[in-house]
Amino acid sequence: TKHPRPTTNNPENCFEYFFAQRESVETIVYLYEVVECRNPQDLLKYDIHGSIVISMFEESWFRLVTKQATGTGKTKVLSVLLVWSYFHKTYEDDSDLSRNFLLITPNIIVLDRIRTDFDGLKIFFDDPLLPPNGYDDQNWNSDFQLSLHIQDEVGTLNKKGNIFLTNIHRVYDRKDSHPSYDDENTMDYFLGDKPVTKTQNNKVVLRDIVRDIDELLIMNDEAHHIHDSKLSWFKSIQDIHNNLLQKNCRLSLQIDVTATPKHDNGNIFVQTVSDYPLVEAIAQRVVKRPVLPD
């Protein structure tokens, strides 16, 4: 659907999601809502080649991965899915989804890029994500009340919903996780723990907060970093899920977006449900075509 979004220079300007963005969102919504997939076993019936077995799924919770080439708008996909989960939990009876979201990035560079969209929750109001109040007899704008918490700067938790935006290092449980040569980022292993700086010296520890809430949906940007169950990133999510199980709850869903959903051996993640490669993005002029000098 095209959404009118006039500007000074172009009064007829319209906003429209790319096909690949819509495909990623629609695939996840279809698997969850239409065919009601809730665990790794439910995905096996869609393997038409019969090459996937349950032992290939290293997690016991429901995880879905979308492959999107760099520069094709992964943040847009995450924002749509976040709104979908929020209103599903708000308006649907017995919804298993969540109004609390842990959005994990691999490093500060990626976090700062996403933060420009999420600061002030502006992406949800700049993009056509919220239907007007009264549509389908619901107060969409009024009911969309989320609090944004960045890194360990956690304010009062909002009973109506929270977004925790962080890099993965804030989620590690340092008591159980020590720097290792096998880590994706070996800097701490070789150089030791980073010194505490003014911006790191926070009173609230994010990893303790997310382990204490009763409902949570996790989103991972640049999710190719979770390619091994031995890595601290995977173990941190597993720990969150296990804590929820102890409270008779569970992780609502894990959604991963990455341009390279592959293990070190080259095998694609079995949880991958949509694929938008760079070659296709270039051909459709979604990203710039590289030019080689003579």
Where are each of the predicted segments found?
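RecA-like P-loop NTPase motor core of helicase/translocase proteins
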Residues: 1-294
